[in-house]
Structures are given as C-alpha cells and as structure tokens.
Amino acid sequence: MNPRRQARSDVTTSFTQVAAGDGRGGGTTVAVRIAATIVACALSVAVVACSNPQSPSAEAGFTTSVSVPLDAPLSHLHGLHVDRSGTLLAGTHSGLFSIDVATGVTARVGDSDDDFMGLGGASGTDDLVSSGHPGPSSDAPNPLGLRASRDGGQTWMTRSRSGSTDFHALATDGTSLVGSDGRGLQTSNDGGVTWNPGADVTVGALTITPSGVWAVTPDGAARSTDGGRSFTAMPAAPPLALISGTSRGLWGVDGAGYVWSSADGAEWDKGGRVGAVQALTSGPDGTGYAASSDAVYVLERSDATG
C-alpha cells in the first residue's frame, strides 16, 4: 500500500449510520455515539455502522449502528450542507429537506419543489447556493441558473444565468464561488452575479478550503491555488468520487464507497466502507456527513488517546 494513503496509528475515524427502516412504524431508537466504543477499538480506523443486513462492511474496523426510517423524497441527493444551527440540509430532485442525524427524521424546508442541483454553501451558515431545474409547481425558466438563499433555504432568489446554465457542482467559502456545468469551470467573486472562465476541466465534485479549490476529476483529485483558473494533480490522494472540506480538513469517498480523511490533502487515512453514498459535506467543526437514498452517516476523526 502507498504509505501516504495508509491509515496512521494515531488517528481514529468513526462513523454513525442512521439508516432507513421498514417504514411500518414500530419503535424508533436514537443513534448514540459512545466514547467507550472508540476506546475499545484496537485498530486505528473504526467505522460505526449498523448490524442489520444493509450495513456497510467492516473491513477497516469495528461496526455498530442504529437504523431509523428516512422519508422517500430523499432519493436523488444532489448536495448536503450544514446550516448555522447545525442542521443538515439535503438538496434533492424534489426540493430541499432537513435531516435529523440523530433520528433520521426529514422535513421539507421552504415551499420549493425544484430540483436542487449543486447545493452548497459556506459551512455553518444560512447562506446557500444552488442550481437545477424548476419543479412541477414552478414557472421559472429551465435551467434555473445560479440561485441563492440567505435564510437557510426558506426562500430563494435568482443571481444569474437563469435559463442558460445548470451548475451540477458548486462550492463557496462565502467569498469565492466556483461552479461547473460540465463544460469547464466558472468562477465568481461577487456571489455569482458575474462570472469568469476558470480551468477547462471536467469535475464531479468541488470544495473550497483555505488551501485552495479542490476538485474530483476523471484523472483524480486536483487542487487550485489561484481560485479555480488552473489545477495541479494531487498524486497522494486516493481515487475519490466525492470530496468536501473546511479549515478542519478534508473528507472523501472513493468509487468503492470507502471513506478517506486528510488534514491537508498531502496524506490520507482510509476509513471504513459506507457504500454508494450520493452526497458529502463537512461541518464547521470538522465533522463529515455522507448520505445515500436511505441512510445518513456521521463521520468523525479524532486523535487516539492510548
């Protein structure tokens, strides 16, 4: 194994899974992360997941979890965001939803039933950006262009590109904004009112950290230190399908569904397998969140104490 990707002995990565139940009612159990579980782990990488048949495999460590039902509309997830209150928001094919990561309960946010492509925002804020297509109740032009919300997704306003651009990937740190519509990158320094051409690169996911703009490309992870105008390949990174980060570090999920974490993008630690998740985001405290159509995973990285 490439030593730059090998899990280091001083790091523990744990996951709590909140998975969909059978939808028939019944008792609901709240997922609780127990510190003793982490202490008991003899391996350096632990995955806290569910013991039911839908659980991810435990090749990288020990697994336990709790399963609770999720609402059906959370299929076709296009993005996740942690708002100012710490609530996890999910952009879907049929609107914006909140997810209670302790119980798995979801609720619609606002009145829109639009297709929320590229949902994102500066982590820990109520300032969101999105693109996509109008829903059944909307008469907005298709595609929606760049939209923004200042109230956590309750209401939305059009910023630019209405009727012309569908951003499938968006990333912002609150100052810079980078977007991809499948025809190269576009960059903005005024919240998406005006745009400038960026690198001519195909990306599947974008995130912005203090170290630069990170992108998942067909050739692997790459980083830009000039606001998205050019990118440099990061050979130490695993073959990621999703990436997200803040000043507290980076999270990634590879094509096989394994989770990776990195403090700086130079060295990566491999965690357990969460499977075919559709979206990934990072909270302001460094916690990661990944979601599939029927489960949400809370990802934590902590220093081992013994």
Give short role names for the model-derived ranges.
Residues 137-143, 180, 216:
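Short, solvent-exposed loop/turn segments at conserved positions within beta-propeller repeat blades
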Residues 76-79, 114-122, 164-172, 201-210, ...:
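Repeated scaffold domains used in trafficking and secretory/extracellular systems
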Residues 69-73, 109-112, 160-163, 196-201, ...:
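Surface loop/turn motifs at the tips and blade-to-blade linkers of beta-strand repeat domains
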Residues 95-109, 143-159, 186-197, 222-233, ...:
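Asp-box/BNR beta-propeller loop motif
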Residues 281-306:
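Blade-level signature of beta-propeller repeat domains, shared across WD40, Kelch, NHL, RCC1
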Residues 51-53:
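Bacterial signal peptide processing site
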Residues 69-97, 115-118:
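Beta-strand-rich domains and repeat architectures in extracellular enzymes and scaffolds
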Residues 46-49:
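C-terminal motif of bacterial Sec signal peptides marking the signal peptidase cleavage site
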